[in-house]
Regions:
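Alpha-helical transmembrane segments used as membrane anchors
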Residues: 1-180
Length: 180
């Protein structure tokens, strides 16, 4: 199998994961059978019991931020279907992880608990709550927000793999009308 075909196939697999996770998360019901719920009623999740267990696990660990995981698979699918490649994988995936964790802490600090189909849960799941709580114990509320904001900004350097200020300046320079 050639490298081009392999990339397309991988792109289709990532797109399938996006669809499965997206539908599982959208049709999630906290009352479906799952790791911590016993139920005799029929599963409401459109992806069946596997979707129910998957969505419950993602919501418990990552909360609403779990939707970013699905969209990450969508991003990877477009990348591979268009036969592009991430040239520097380590910085890119480090940036993705740092972005996800810092955004989880920030959003958990700001939004706290949310109501999901009649059940209260942490916006960023157990992971976001534990990280936010740990940072707040060490640095206080302002320090936690500052540090997570700083890490969010740093993650953009890893993701874009280019100087951010320079990229912003180039973007604005192109949009200015030509002076006569």
């Amino acid at each position: 199998m050639s490298g081009e075909v392999r990339k397309e196939l991988l792109g289709v697999v990532f797109f399938g994961l996006f669809i499965f996770l997206g539908v599982s998360l959208i049709s999630y019901s906290p009352f479906d059978v799952s790791f911590h719920t016993v139920s005799s009623r029929p599963t409401q999740n459109l992806c069946g019991k596997v979707g129910s267990y998957t969505a419950d696990l993602i919501f418990q660990i990552f909360g609403i931020m779990g939707f970013l995981i699905a969209f990450f698979f969508l991003f990877l699918s477009f990348l591979y279907i268009r036969k592009r490649e991430i040239t520097q994988k380590a910085p890119f995936f480090s940036g993705v992880g740092l972005f996800f964790l810092s955004a989880s802490i920030l959003l958990q600090s700001i939004l706290g608990e949310v109501d999901v189909k009649g059940v209260r849960m942490f916006f960023s799941g157990l992971l976001g709550f534990v990280l936010k709580d740990g940072l707040e114990r060490l640095f206080g509320q302002f320090g936690s927000l500052f540090i997570s904001s700083l890490f969010l900004f740093i993650s953009l350097f890893f993701l874009l793999q280019a100087p951010i200020i320079e990229a912003i300046e180039k973007r604005f320079k192109r949009r200015r009308p030509v002076e006569r």
